[in-house]
Curated annotation (Swiss-Prot):
This is Major surface glycoprotein G. GO terms for biological process: symbiont entry into host cell; virion attachment to host cell. Pfam families: Glycoprotein_G (PF00802). Residues 140-150, 254-285 have a biased composition (Polar residues). Residues 67-297 are extracellular. The lineage of its organism: Viruses, Riboviria, Orthornavirae, Negarnaviricota, Haploviricotina. It comes from Human respiratory syncytial virus A (strain rsb6256). Residues 211-232 have a biased composition (Basic and acidic residues). Glycans are attached at residues 70, 72, 80, 86-87, 92, 100, 103, 105, 113, 119, 135, 137-139, 144, 147, 199, 203, 219, 231, 235, 237, 251, 253, 269, 275, 282-283, 287, 294. Residues 287-297 have a biased composition (Pro residues). Residues 105-139, 235-253 have a biased composition (Low complexity). Keywords: Disulfide bond, Glycoprotein, Host cell membrane, Host membrane, Host-virus interaction, Membrane, Secreted, Transmembrane, Transmembrane helix, Viral attachment to host cell, Viral immunoevasion, Virion, Virus entry into host cell. Residues 187-198 are annotated as: Binding to host heparan sulfate. Residues 190-207 have a biased composition (Basic residues). GO terms for cellular component: extracellular region; host cell plasma membrane; membrane; virion membrane.
Amino acid sequence: MSKTKDQRTAKTLERTWDTLNHLLFISSCLYKLNLKSIAQITLSILAMIISTSLIIAAIIFIASANHKVTLTTAIIQDATSQIKNTTPTYLTQNPQLGISFSNLSETTSQPTTTPAPTTPSAESTPQSTTVKTKNTTTTQIQPSKPTTKQRQNKPPNKPNNDFHFEVFNFVPCSICSNNPTCWAICKRIPNKKPGKKTTTKPTKKPTIKTTKKDLKPQTTKPKEVLTTKPTEKPTINTTRTNIRTTLLTTNTTGNPEYTSQKETLHSTSPEGNPSPSQVYTTSEYPSQPPSPSNTTN
């Protein structure tokens, strides 16, 4: 009955919780709308009431859960105390096992057993025996022929120092007590197992290829001197004419006289050497010889 009541209360609390959550959501949505002041006030009051009721419901729910926990713990404690007070007797009917009645505590009274009827088929069928203690009755069902499994004989644990028999092929000195021949042959072994030797392989050096150089002396060729030939200029025969004009001088008598005209012609030979100048003197009037005063060199 108590379980059904607890379930009902839990369901009612869940329903109230859900309804209050829905109401709070609806009131918050309505409050966002621009309503009149009276409606907003009523919605705010309703939201406050719903929130307080939610808090109260949560407290009730937590309290009921704690009550359930305390009830279960009390039931467990009662059961353990009853188990401690009761001392069941272990009954066996097989005389081969050599087990007799044994009471675990001296405080309990002697158990009353009801003997089972002896029939020829009693050995094959299981028999039930009832044992009465202070206020509790326990029934025990025991088979007539218990199955016994053969236990596997485990090998004895080897001592820690016996590892050398498997590893080494010689006689350890721990065996020799007073035998001199044994002491002559045996070898002392450390207590700890020998660790693996770390072998470091030598790193191969990189092979450097060497090319044999020619032992013949290198013949150095002399550098060729670049000779620049002068470019031959074309020979151009140029004639320079130095014409000196004679100034017309008028005599006091009024007869004009022409002075001699000198022409110098300079010609260049193909080798570039200038030729001697030739001077030509002419006179306009052959009848009159040129006077030294009028001629100009």
